[in-house]
Curated annotation (Swiss-Prot):
Membrane topology: Lipid-anchor
GO cellular component annotations of the record: endomembrane system; plasma membrane
PROSITE patterns: RAB
Gene3D superfamilies: P-loop containing nucleotide triphosphate hydrolases
Protein name: Ras-related protein RIC2
Disulfide bonds: none
PANTHER family xref list: DRAB11-RELATED
Primary role: Possesses GTPase activity.
Keywords attached to this entry: Cell membrane, GTP-binding, Lipoprotein, Membrane, Nucleotide-binding, Prenylation
Positions of GTP binding: 21-28, 69-73, 127-130
InterPro entries documented for this protein: P-loop_NTPase (IPR027417), Rab_GTPases_membrane_traffic (IPR050209), Small_GTP-bd (IPR005225), Small_GTPase (IPR001806)
GO molecular function terms noted in the UniProt entry: GTP binding; GTPase activity
Compartments where found: Cell membrane
Organism annotation: Oryza sativa subsp. japonica
Amino acid sequence: MAAGYRAEDDYDYLFKVVLIGDSGVGKSNLLSRFTRNEFSLESKSTIGVEFATRSLQVDGKVVKAQIWDTAGQERYRAITSAYYRGAVGALLVYDVTRHSTFENVERWLKELRDHTDPNIVVMLVGNKSDLRHLVAVQTDEGKAFAERESLYFMETSALESTNVENAFAEVLTQIYRIVSKRSVEAGDDAGSGPGKGEKINIKDDVSAVKKGGCCSG
């Protein structure tokens, strides 16, 4: 195969990442900004579930992200189990201009951990950082919650494309590092690890990026 050429579906790893958080916090625009570099001011609530994909290079490997998005309204809770199944990363999103969306982050995190391995790679995202004059959730508040729960943290603006790439890339990089570390520890010189293009379900290996481990609540 010629160096430098890769077909669209030629990837080394496939990671499922879910977007969670209240309705209206900008999950769909984060998804469209990252996967298509698009933003819609007239965003309608997502009906049911949609997902988009994008591939990134991480340490010379092609990592394909399958990113799932659903509306945050309670009436969609019936799809919860299928939505979370197999997810190895999550962006937990709140709107920095609406404090109630930040208050609900704890409930979303509990739901996430109820349906996935508790060591899933999670990035707490304070979106709409471009609306500086309307900020209701201070950066320190988000940072403190993230540190308490061993989450990663970034503030983003899907509108201005601020930190959107960084947030997704950080989650994918951390997942990849856990997977590659596991392969090295298992003596994966003979190619006994996951096959090319295989979807990875990290389970307990994600604990490698946690600072203080995880306690059962």
